[in-house]
């Protein structure tokens, strides 16, 4: 969906007439040319600086192998950005626009009530066939309901470079291949409706992801975590 210059964006219209219907009908959608060349370049340059300065670390697996680095399963390198850090003005601007889009979606997202989101996860697949095996962002009710990914890869040719995000929409007879091209913004449900994988990348591949939380599910997840922590500490104390 080409959007043109950022100053002409009608974010509310995009949210209500495009994002909301697409999420409910197919579970995902994307916007192309979201920031425009100039602002998108500023985001890309900052991400490259983070990469070249050694700020990125191997991505970790969640679930039963939480905290474990398995490069053959997940090959990205990541760091977390709030947007207020020095030199991250363009990233902060991007995040503010995504926030507004999600805000405009509002109650039309169904059962979800979004009050907060994660920091931005800056990710780099360094090439050499690195990818991320099929998985679900939120399989166990941790509160994440919407995944937003902003891609930063100029002159990307999926036939040469790979790196396609393949989505396996639940209950659908098709798969969806999303190429990680520069200035593309993807929205999708975070739960089991959208299993997905990052196919092997043969060139440096950059992306930035934020997750929006449903307030009730997030509060319940935090409560369960606190209870588990207390039980673990109590068991260790008895030993």
UniProtKB/Swiss-Prot annotation:
The record's account of tissue expression is: Highly expressed in vascular smooth muscle. Moderately expressed in esophagus, stomach, small bowel and aorta. Low levels in tail and kidney. Expression also in pheochromocytoma cell line PC-12.
Q: What is its EC number?
A: 1.14.11.-, 1.14.11.29
The GO molecular function terms of this record are: 2-oxoglutarate-dependent dioxygenase activity; ferrous iron binding; hypoxia-inducible factor-proline dioxygenase activity; L-ascorbic acid binding; peptidyl-proline 4-dioxygenase activity; peptidyl-proline dioxygenase activity
Q: Which residue intervals make up region (Required for interaction with ADRB2)?
A: 88-104
Per its record, what triggers expression of this gene product?
By PDGF and angiotensin II in aortic smooth muscle cells. By deprivation of NGF in neuronal cell cultures. Induced during coronary heart ligation.
PTM comment text = Ubiquitinated by SIAH1 and/or SIAH2 in response to the unfolded protein response (UPR), leading to its degradation.
Q: Which residues bind 2-oxoglutarate?
A: 205
Say yes or no: keyword Cytoplasm present.
yes
Residue positions annotated to bind Fe cation are 135, 137, 196
Share the domain note from the entry.
The Beta(2)beta(3) 'finger-like' loop domain is important for substrate (HIFs' CODD/NODD) selectivity.
Give the function comment from the record. Answer: Prolyl hydroxylase that mediates hydroxylation of proline residues in target proteins, such as PKM, TELO2, ATF4 and HIF1A. Target proteins are preferentially recognized via a LXXLAP motif. Cellular oxygen sensor that catalyzes, under normoxic conditions, the post-translational formation of 4-hydroxyproline in hypoxia-inducible factor (HIF) alpha proteins. Hydroxylates a specific proline found in each of the oxygen-dependent degradation (ODD) domains (N-terminal, NODD, and C-terminal, CODD) of HIF1A. Also hydroxylates HIF2A. Has a preference for the CODD site for both HIF1A and HIF2A.
What name goes with this protein? Prolyl hydroxylase EGLN3
